[in-house]
Amino acid sequence: MTSKIFKFFLTWWLTQQVTGLAVPFMLDMAPNAFDDQYESCVEDMEKKAPQLLQEDFNMNEELKLEWEKAEINWKEIKNSTSYPAGFHDFHGTALVAYTGNLAIDFNRAVRDFKKSPDNFHYKAFHYYLTRAVQLLNDQGCSLVYRGTKVMFEYTGKGSVRFGQFSSSSLTKRVALSSNFFSNHGTLFIIRTCLGVNIKEFSSFPREEEVLIPGYEVYHKVTAQNDNGYNEIFLDSPERKKSNFNCFYNGSAQTVNIDFSISGSRESCVSLFLVVLLGLLVQQLTLAEL
């Protein structure tokens, strides 16, 4: 009986550690991210991207399936959707696909690009989504809200960026809903000038989604915990030069790129706890046989 009680509390404690309640994510400049803005190579990329898309399809079955579904949805809504000159079907399909089931895996790949650049199978998708956001941007700024189920912290020094495409909402209520937020997470209150309203393209228009590109940098960061949960205010946004530019165009420009793996200490701790949990529970189970 004693061993069962011990096993229960041990499992509970380790689970809390593994789920991230004790290991928050640090908000920084996302140094591993793929942040290409395709400056001065849009015309060339428009020619090359269809080929890259087919190559990605061959390596990424989920992307292929989600793209095909998004193509159908885009054809159904394009005639009732307003979009600027230069915005074509590939851009529309990319936006629709992003609001479906691709966002989590895609953003993980974008955020950790430098750790495994050869395994990045979203080359064309990243281009089309980036261009869609750039074309839709009306040069205006908005106050938006982004809820997360994981805790973020800020060191108090330096500018920050998300390093991935980040969904937000014009409505605080949406960001605080259980679909996006938990009390162990973070509410971001963001002044964005590069984010664009994609309500017309979204699979969930009631969310009033504003999509923020990962290269928007925030120079003023304020964190507080006055409402019983973590809040981070991001202000003074700016579009700064990216680490990558025209990377898949054959005339790549990079800024101080180091492709060595820069894994975080927090990831190592989480992995260790997962392994420890499994081993200890296994030993306790065997001891009761």
From Swiss-Prot:
UniProt keyword terms in alphabetical order: Cell membrane, Disulfide bond, Glycoprotein, Glycosyltransferase, GPI-anchor, Hydrolase, Lipoprotein, Membrane, NAD, NADP, Nucleotidyltransferase, Signal, Transferase
Which reaction(s) does its UniProt entry say it catalyses?
Answer: L-arginyl-[protein] + NAD(+) = N(omega)-(ADP-D-ribosyl)-L-arginyl-[protein] + nicotinamide + H(+); NAD(+) + H2O = ADP-D-ribose + nicotinamide + H(+)
UniProt-annotated location(s): Cell membrane
Q: Which cysteines are joined by disulfide bonds?
A: 41-246, 141-193
Q: Which InterPro entries match?
A: ADP-ribosyltransferase_ARG (IPR050999), ART (IPR000768)
Supply the Pfam families for this chain: ART (PF01129)
Ranges of residues in domain TR mART core = 61-241
What residues does NAD(+) bind to? 98, 146, 164, 202
Give the source's domain of life in one word. Answer: Eukaryota
| Cleavable signal peptide | 1-20
Tell me the active site: 146, 167, 209
Enzyme Commission number(s): 2.4.2.31, 3.2.2.5
Where does it sit, as one GO cellular component term?
external side of plasma membrane
Function summary = Has both NAD(+) glycohydrolase and ADP-ribosyltransferase activity.
Name the family the entry cites.
Answer: Belongs to the Arg-specific ADP-ribosyltransferase family.
State what protein this is by name: T-cell ecto-ADP-ribosyltransferase 2
**Upper lineage ranks?**
Eukaryota, Metazoa, Chordata, Craniata, Vertebrata
Gene name? Art2b
